[in-house]
C-alpha cells in the first residue's frame, strides 16, 4: 500500500477551446447540470501547472454519478489544439450509458460531435450484445456511448 488512501473520484477534466460550446453540449444534449463557472487565479494556476501565463476559465458540470471539469485556457498565447488519435498514449474519453445509442449519436452530432468510427454491436464475451460508439468534437473531446444489450432495438 502507498501510505495514503484514495477516498473517491472527484472529477474528470477536459481542456477545450470554447467553453460556451462545450457547456452547451453537456447541459443541453446530455442533461448535465452546470455547477460553477468562472475564472481562476492566474498566479495559483502558474504555480500548479508550471505554465507561464496560465489564464483560465473553468466550469464544472454534473452528470449522473460523475462531475466533469471543463477548462478553457485564455493564455498563454502559444497554446494549441492537439488532435490525438484514440490509439495514442494520453488520449482519454468518458463513457456514458444511454438507452438509445442512435439518438445519442444524432443529438451529439447537433453539437459538433462526429462518429469516430461506427456504432458497433459487441458479438462475444461478457459485453455481448452491448452497442458502442465513440464520438469526438473539434477539440478531440471524446465521448463513448454504451447501450446495454437489453435496451431498445438492435
Specify the residue positions occupied by each region the protein language model found.
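Vicinal oxygen chelate
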Residues: 1-5, 14, 37, 60, ...
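Exposed loop/turn and edge beta-strand positions of beta-sandwich/beta-sheet ligand-binding modules
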Residues: 8, 55, 90, 129
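Short, structured motif recognition centered on aromatic/hydrophobic residues
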Residues: 9, 61, 68-71, 91, ...
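Core segments of cupin and vicinal oxygen chelate
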Residues: 15-65, 103, 110, 123-128, ...
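A short, acidic/glycine-rich surface segment
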Residues: 42-47, 77-82, 124, 153-154
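Long, charged/polar, surface-exposed segments that mediate recognition or autoinhibition
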Residues: 82-87, 104-106
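Short secondary-structure subsegments characteristic of cysteine-rich extracellular domains
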Residues: 83, 91-96
Amino acid at each position: 500500500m502507498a501510505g495514503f488512501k484514495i477516498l473517491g473520484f472527484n472529477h474528470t477534466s477536459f481542456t477545450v477551446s470554447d467553453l460556451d460550446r462545450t457547456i452547451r453540449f453537456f447541459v443541453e444534449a446530455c442533461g448535465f447540470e452546470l455547477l460553477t463557472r468562472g475564472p481562476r487565479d492566474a498566479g495559483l494556476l502558474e504555480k500548479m501547472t508550471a505554465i507561464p501565463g496560465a489564464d483560465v476559465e473553468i466550469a464544472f458540470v454534473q452528470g449522473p454519478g460523475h462531475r466533469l471539469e471543463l477548462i478553457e485556457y485564455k493564455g498563454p498565447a502559444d497554446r494549441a489544439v492537439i488532435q490525438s488519435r484514440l490509439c495514442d498514449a494520453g488520449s482519454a474519453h468518458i463513457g456514458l450509458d444511454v438507452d438509445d445509442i442512435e439518438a445519442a449519436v444524432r443529438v451529439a452530432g447537433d453539437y459538433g460531435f462526429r462518429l469516430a468510427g461506427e456504432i458497433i454491436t459487441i458479438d462475444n464475451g461478457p459485453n455481448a450484445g452491448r452497442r458502442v460508439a465513440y464520438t469526438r468534437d473539434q477539440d478531440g473531446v471524446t465521448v463513448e456511448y454504451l447501450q446495454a444489450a437489453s435496451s431498445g432495438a438492435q
